[in-house]
Structure formats: C-alpha cells, structure tokens
Curated annotation (Swiss-Prot):
The keyword Phosphoprotein does not apply. Transmembrane segments: none annotated. Its EC number is 3.4.19.12. This is Putative ubiquitin carboxyl-terminal hydrolase L293.
C-alpha cells in the first residue's frame, strides 16, 4: 500500500520546474598568423682597406709597395720600390730611425802600419825585383804598355806563365791561346838586357787586343781601359796563377730591424773597387783611410737595390757589407773615377801609402806598393796612361821606374816614407792615380 507522506501542516512542496541545461558554447579562438619578417638582401662584404704600410716578417715595411690612392698595395715594378731615405710618406719614413746598423770590424790595421819599421823589414826580406824594358806605343796602346809593366812586377804570376806551356784556363779557343803565348814571349823579351833599350814593335798586338778584349772584327785600334785589360787577362789564366791576385770574401746581408746577419754569399774579384762616392768625399785622403772607409761601409739597400726574401717573396730593406775573407799575394786596388751618368773623370789627389797592413780572422798581411797606373785626361775613355813601378832597394832608398810609353826614368824615395810623393807619378794637371798594386812584403821577387 502506498503511503503518501504529508507534513504537519499538510502542505505539499511543489515540484521545481526543470530548467533545461544549455550546453556552454566556448568562443572559437582565432589563429593569428605571424607578421612576415622582411629580410633585407645580403650586402657583399667589402674588403678592409690596407690603410697602414704592409709590413714584412720583421715588422718593417716591405719595399715593393705603393699607395694606390686608397690603400697600400704590392707592386711588381722595381722602379716603384720605396727609397726609404727619400720617401715623403710619414707612415713609412717613421720606421727609418728604428733601423739598426751592424757593427763592422775594420780589416785595415792602421795602428800596425803606423808603427811599421821598414829598416827592420829590409834586413829580413828581399826588395830587389826584376825590372822590365819600356814598351813603345803601338797605336793607342798605352793602356796595354802600362798593364804589361804592372803584370811584369807580379813575379809569381809572370813566372808561372813563363815556366809553363799550359798556363791558361782549359777549353779556351786556339786563337786566345795564341794571344796568351804572344804575351808570354813579350814577357821574356821585356826581361832581356839591356833594360834601357825599349821594345819598339810588337806585331802581334792587334790580335792580342782582339782576343784578350773579346773584340769583334775588324779590330778597332782605339784606346782601352787598363783595368779592363788586366781583369780580362787574369780571368783566363790557370787558377793557380789567377788565385795569386784573386781577392775572396763575403757579401753580408743584415736585417735592418735587429742588425742580425740574415745570409751571406761569397764573391771573388781581381780588383778592390773603391766607390766613387767615397773618393768624392775624400779626394785628398790617404789610400789607407779610403780602404778603411770602403770596408767598414754599411750600405742600406733600398729601392731597386732591395733584396727579395726567398720565403715571402717580398723585397726587404737590408744592410749590406762587403768584406774580404782571404787575402791574396797581390792586392789590386782600382779607384772608381767615372761619373755613372757620363764618361767624365773625377780628378783626385789620393795619397798612396807605401805600405798597407790588413788583418783578417787574426791573420795579418803587410803589403808593399809595387805599381801605380796613372790616367791622364778628362774622360776615362780617352787620354793617356803612365805608370810608376817598383825596382829595388839601395841603402836607405827605394827605387821606382816611371814609364811613359818608350821613355823610362829612375826615381827614388827614402825607405821610411809612409807616402809615395805624388810628384813622382803625377806629371800633368789632369793626372790621377787609377790602379795601385801591392805585393805581400814577405814574397817580393
């Protein structure tokens, strides 16, 4: 049975109306597209300009560069290589005061020469050498005559030639060998008595000139240079003879940044060449001082004279020193008197020392003046040659013979003379000593 419940008041609770449940509608979330990013086009990267000089591995500007107008660039044109002593570019010029020169030992021993006692040396060494007949002028041949007199007094060279049938370099032409044989016979004739009777003819002279001086046909009977003839003549001799007058040494190349030796290369020359600039600056100095200045000279290589670095291929400023390392028996000096821009001769009055003392690697050699070849004239390509050649020692006198073509005269100086008086060999206002020959004082014959 169903029982209907009633409250005490007998009220009935009305039923609540049902509210329909509406599903909640969430608002749709809109997707916001990203704003497209505008990327500017890529600009090409410009190379950084070389606004400072290009430096070498040693921190010094290289020589093979130039200012292009906007930057420093390398150049392959040697005429544009930097001359740092003259450059107007302050960025490069500021490096010059930082250069460090090497310290060079002087091989000219002035102290020993100043105290040299010739009276003692005379008692222990031979000073009587063979003199020669004078040679006439065979047609613009005074260069030849004076050269022959100088070569004659180089006893051990001449003796090697006279005593040997093969005294030249191997492989020379028959014509050149015949020319040397002609000179050999001339040496023999020059040494025959009477010595005061000059040799007035030498039929082989044209061929000798052609072969020794390497001249093409037809031979021009013009004046030649005495130094060139002597150099050519010595160059084709057997090395045993040539080495008697061959000065050997090294060309030293130093880093300008620290004065350290970079590299060196050997050289060999017949003549010790005195630069024109040194003669210009010291026209009345002694030859001893001139040689000292020459062999202690530290030359800055710049511009077209710079040296290429074998590793970087750049051209670098370097200090350059040229010094002998081996002294020969015969020491030949040539005074460079020619202006390189012309053939004009620079006149000078260099005083010729009777003796020189050189010290190399602890070994000292004393040299005695054997010959002076003098050039007369205002141009080295023209003019006249004479020479003064040592003869012997008599008592307290050294005797020399002055040769002027077929003429010869005996002159003398005191044995204690430090300088050969210039009036013995300078006879004309345009005369200047050109070639000087010294011989090892212990080997004179």
């Amino acid at each position: 049975m169903c029982v209907e419940m009633k409250n005490k008041t007998n009220t009935t609770i009305p039923s609540q109306p049902q509210i329909p449940i509406q599903p909640s509608i969430l608002p749709t979330q809109q997707t916001i597209s990203p704003i497209p990013q505008i990327i500017p086009p890529t600009q090409p990267t410009l190379p950084k300009l070389q606004l400072d000089p290009i430096l070498g591995s040693n921190g010094i500007p290289i020589a093979n560069q130039e200012w292009s107008g906007t930057e420093y660039v390398r150049t392959n044109d040697p005429t544009k290589f930097i001359v740092i002593t003259k450059t107007l570019d302050p960025k490069i010029a500021r490096f010059l005061p930082t250069f460090k020169k090497p310290v060079i030992t002087d091989i000219i021993n002035k102290t020993s020469n100043s105290t040299l006692d010739m009276n003692k040396i005379i008692t222990t060494n031979n000073f009587n050498v063979e003199n020669a007949k004078a040679l006439a002028n065979f047609g613009n041949s005074c260069y030849f005559g004076t050269s022959m007199q100088l070569l004659f007094v180089m006893f051990h060279v001449r003796n090697f030639i006279v005593k040997n049938s093969n005294f030249t370099e191997t492989g020379i032409s028959i014509d050149l060998k015949n020319a040397y044989d002609s000179i050999k016979n001339l040496f023999i004739t020059m040494n025959t008595a009477p010595k005061n009777d000059p040799i007035k003819s030498f039929p082989d002279y044209p061929n000798v000139k052609k072969q020794i001086m390497k001249e093409p046909d037809p031979v021009q009977m013009l004046e030649e240079d005495a130094e060139e003839f002597i150099t050519q003549f010595m160059s084709d001799l057997d090395p045993k003879a040539r080495n008697l007058a061959l000065i050997k040494g090294n060309e030293y190349i130093y880093d300008v940044s620290n004065a350290q030796l970079n590299r060196q290369q050997s050289f060999s020359n017949i003549f010790n060449l005195i630069p024109l600039d040194i003669i210009k600056s010291n026209p009345t100095d002694t030859l001893e001082n001139i040689l000292s200045k020459t062999y202690t000279m530290v030359e800055l290589r710049e511009g077209v004279n710079t040296i290429q670095n074998p590793i970087t291929s750049d051209y670098e400023f370097t200090y350059f020193v040229n010094q002998p390392t081996i002294l020969p028996e015969y020491f030949l000096v040539r005074l460079n008197m020619v202006d390189p821009t012309s053939t004009n001769k620079l006149r000078h009055n260099i005083q010729i020392n009777t003796t020189l003392v050189l010290t190399i690697n602890g070994q000292t050699t004393t040299y005695f003046a054997l010959a002076i070849i003098v050039h007369r004239g205002n141009s080295i390509r023209t003019g006249h040659y004479t020479c003064l050649v040592f003869d012997n020692q008599t008592g307290s006198q050294f005797q020399y013979i002055f040769y002027d073509d077929s003429l010869s005269s005996l002159v003398s100086i005191p044995t204690n003379s430090k300088i050969i008086p210039s009036n013995l060999y300078l006879k004309n206002i345009t005369d200047s000593a050109y070639i000087i020959l010294y011989g090892d004082i212990t080997k004179l014959r």
